[in-house]
Design a protein with these regions (language model features):
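A structured beta-alpha segment of the ubiquitous adenosine-cofactor-binding alpha/beta core
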Residues: 62-112
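NAD(P)-binding Rossmann-fold cofactor-contacting core
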Residues: 36-76
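N-terminal Rossmann-fold NAD(P) dinucleotide-binding loop
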Residues: 26-27
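Hydrophobic Val/Ile/Leu positions in short beta-strands of Rossmann-like dinucleotide-binding domains
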Residues: 12, 17-19
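Single conserved hydrophobic/aromatic residue that forms the stacking wall/gate
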Residues: 1-8, 12
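General beta-strand structural signal in soluble alpha/beta enzymes
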Residues: 19, 42-45, 84, 100-101, ...
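Glycine-rich Rossmann-fold phosphate-binding loop(s) that bind the pyrophosphate
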Residues: 22
Length: 184
């Protein structure tokens, strides 16, 4: 997030973000985007996605997915004004400024990338491992979409693994905030 922010200023502030997935990568991408001032409006699982125009209730999603091991559809059943769509591939048709694919490999194909561009997306930053097909990447580049490939976007995860090994070898326990500060 820091390298992107240096190039674009406050890239996340007041931006609408679409996220796929609801596992660790998606949850923490949602948390970071929200901390940086964005409004995350979607999360998904393999059965479908939820659209919350007021912004995702991350505390609920964390409880739903990490504690109760529920399905994302339950979010729509408990939150007023939320839409559930029983097709996770359609998450990329939701208008957004920033797309964070955090679910699975090859989840954004050419048609999905074209839908993102048509609906105003200007930034795609990959959280999942290779979520965009080569055809999708061509669409981003041809349309001036700022594209953060998984290799670059996940560098923080690799660095965090190194920090975790250091922490373990010294028998220390760092808070989330301490790890985040060390990454910066």
């Amino acid at each position: 997030d820091r390298s992107v922010s240096r190039g674009l200023g406050d890239v996340y502030k007041r931006q609408t973000v679409v996220i796929s997935g609801s596992g660790n990568v998606a949850i923490y991408a949602c948390e970071k985007a929200t901390q940086l001032g964005a409004k995350v409006v979607t999360m998904s699982d393999s059965n479908g996605y939820v659209y919350d125009p007021n912004g995702i209730d991350l505390a609920y999603v964390k409880d739903l997915k990490e504690v109760r091991r529920g399905r994302i559809k339950e979010y729509a059943e408990t939150h007023e004004g939320v839409t559930y769509v029983a097709d996770c591939t359609k998450v990329w048709t939701v208008p957004c400024d920033i797309a964070l694919p955090c679910a699975t490999q090859n989840e954004i194909n050419k048609e999905s990338a074209e839908a993102l561009v048509k609906n105003g997306c200007t930034v795609v930053c990959e959280g999942a491992n290779m979520p965009s097909t080569p055809d999708a990447i061509e669409v981003y580049l041809a349309n001036g979409v700022l594209y953060g490939p998984a290799k670059a976007a996940n560098a923080g995860g690799v660095a965090t693994s190194g920090l975790e090994m250091s922490q373990n070898s010294e028998r220390l326990s760092w808070t989330f905030e301490e790890v985040d500060a060390k990454l910066k």
